[in-house]
């Protein structure tokens, strides 16, 4: 798993994504997956030409063998050609990866509104947030959520960068599926 978090700030939106990729070996007789290691070289954030940020967690390949990054990039190209709204783009992205084991988050500013859209694997509905959101290994994040919510209020993007790095590191200390370092992207 991984962790992607977004915070809506007074002057923009900040998104963090860890780098951890979990490596599995599949037992050919049972189909059971076993963790064999980790690598910290996987980028989970993509900035679009329309200045939106898309984050994803889950497997790097869909059930049909396609790479998730390739599917997302192709969906973005179509979305930009058609000039889709953030909501329509997100719905299209979900339709492209729905059969995999992935979750998505997309942030952007549209009509002066700061928007965070979240879809967890298996959800029927999209969550629309005004404050922020998280996808991935959010179970480990739950113990920090009340402190995080207090610290998050009325932040500017510069402060939110340090806040997301701090919580990413804290959560990484509790679960091996999250790297202690994370990449940051900002929309203003």
Summary of predicted features, one role per range:
Residues 1-188:
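N-terminal nucleophile
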